[in-house]
A protein has these predicted regions:
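NAD(P)-binding Rossmann-fold cofactor-contacting core
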Residues: 1-20, 24-28, 190
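A general structural signal for well-ordered alpha-helical segments in protein cores
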Residues: 8-11, 45, 49, 78, ...
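Metal- and O2-centered redox machinery and metal/ROS homeostasis
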Residues: 18, 79, 83, 243-246, ...
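NAD(P)-dependent dehydrogenase/reductase Rossmann-like domain
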Residues: 257-295
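Rossmann-fold NAD(P) dinucleotide-binding segment
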Residues: 26-97
Length: 295
């Protein structure tokens, strides 16, 4: 990760806590890397690819560089990024990918997870990383190991397939969180929040458990999810002909949370408010009330 990256101090602090090496520039990053994983807010996906091609263009090298775009963008968006990389005429192999599931973490000894395997990474929970495109990692001496450790799965030779899978997957998970946020905020205003939770807990206990986990976890990420919902809307419109209104509405929910004077200031690892479903509903309701109140 380049130290001069326009990342927030919080991002740099998390990188250091995770013992990720910080480099001085994109050129240093490209010079020292065989594979670059791009994981940035969706709005920055194209610009990040351009930064890498610009950095590589400044080096006198014929060594191949793998660029793995793992960002939450529409198939058409990642295809445009891939086309831009190809036009650079640089020795870059472009891989389309996505991240499905939660961040990796150590699991208790002998605990089984959906990502456990027989290799030495089996004591970690790992998200699934579907990849697509014609470029695999066969030319790398550590290619097979990389695929295994990162839990990658080749799903298609077509650029756009892995990103499309992310869009369909996230529509169900983050789309649900947007709906739940609206539902519980409205119930708070009506004075029926506890009653709603009781009824959902009786008839759909798994749904309540999902909401109680996903909604409080959302505020620090809401600013990223605005564009992700827009990319889902674009995907469903371009690939299936659906109207964009549903997920543009979800984007609006996350925009309201990101701009909320309380919830919008929440940071991962430094949570103060919105750590429960009830408090998200309360803070969101207060923010929307202020927004609607005439000045």
């Amino acid at each position: 990760m380049p130290a001069k990256d326009p990342s927030s101090k919080d991002t740099i602090e998390r990188a250091r806590d995770a013992e990720v090496e910080l480099l001085k520039s994109d050129v240093d990053l490209v010079r020292q890397s065989s594979v670059i994983l791009s994981i940035v807010p969706p709005k920055d996906a194209g610009a990040t690819a351009t930064r890498i091609t610009d950095a590589l263009a400044g080096l006198d090298t014929t060594r191949e560089l793998y660029f793995v775009d793992l960002n939450a963008v529409a198939p058409s968006t990642v295809k445009a990024i891939a086309a831009s990389v190809k036009r650079s005429n640089l020795p870059i192999r472009f891989v389309d990918g996505s991240i499905l599931g939660h961040p990796p973490k150590k699991t208790p000894a002998n605990a089984a997870t959906e990502s456990s395997s027989s290799d030495d990474s089996s004591d970690w929970y790992r998200p699934s990383i579907p990849i697509s495109g014609s470029d695999g990692f066969g030319s790398l001496p550590f290619g097979k190991k990389l695929v295994s450790v990162l839990n990658m799965k080749q799903i298609s030779p077509e650029i756009g397939a892995a990103s499309g899978l992310k869009m369909c997957f996230a529509s169900l998970s983050k789309g649900f969180t947007a709906i739940a946020t609206q539902s519980f905020t409205t119930a708070h205003n009506l004075g029926i929040l506890d009653a709603l939770k009781d009824e959902i807990g009786t008839f759909y206990p798994a749904t309540l458990a999902n909401a109680e986990k996903s909604v409080p976890g959302m505020p620090p990420k809401a600013y990223r999810w605005v564009r992700e919902m827009e990319e889902i809307a674009l995907t469903f419109n371009e690939e299936a002909g659906w109207d964009t209104k549903m997920f543009m509405g979800a984007a609006s929910v996350y925009k309201d949370i990101a701009e909320n004077e309380v919830l919008g200031n929440e940071k991962i690892g430094k949570r103060k408010r919105g750590t429960t479903l009830d408090d998200v509903a309360k803070a969101a309701a207060e923010g929307l009330h202020k927004k609607q109140r005439p000045h």
